[in-house]
Amino acid sequence: TRDFRDAEAAAASTLAVELFSIEGVERVFFGPDFLTVGKTRAHDWSHLKAPILAAIMDHFTSGQPLFAGSDDAAGGHDDAVYEGETAQIVAEIKDLLDTRIRPAVAQDGGDILFNRFDEATGVVYLNMRGACSGCPSSSATLKAGVENMLKHYVPEVTAVEQTL
């Protein structure tokens, strides 16, 4: 996933650059199988919808890659190697995130990425992206929804914290 908060940051994606060239677009987020476009308050969706859809269609029919290079999945994923029981715990956490939590969050235009698991404290660190990263209720979603589900299915989890 990739989250572009301004046109300058969008240089890694020709589609994001094109979307930011549309007056009123203020944010572009690419999820694993969706994209979210954010607009300024001063602009109305009725004027933005057609040029946004045209930019998306033009990009995907052109055959260009979504990102320059092979950086399609840049994001807060953990590079650590877990072993033994901890590897099983992390696999369970990632499975729950992928099958139950991420699809629900994607419906609101966001994504949650696994960052790391601290086996000593039982804390899971997650990275909220897209609409979720700026949403005022994201902390409540993280604590009430995600933390409760992970603690229920994976007893070794004691807490969930957001990373930036």
List the predicted regions and their residue ranges:
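Domain-level signature for proteins that mediate thiol-based redox and metal-cofactor handling
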Residues: T1-L164
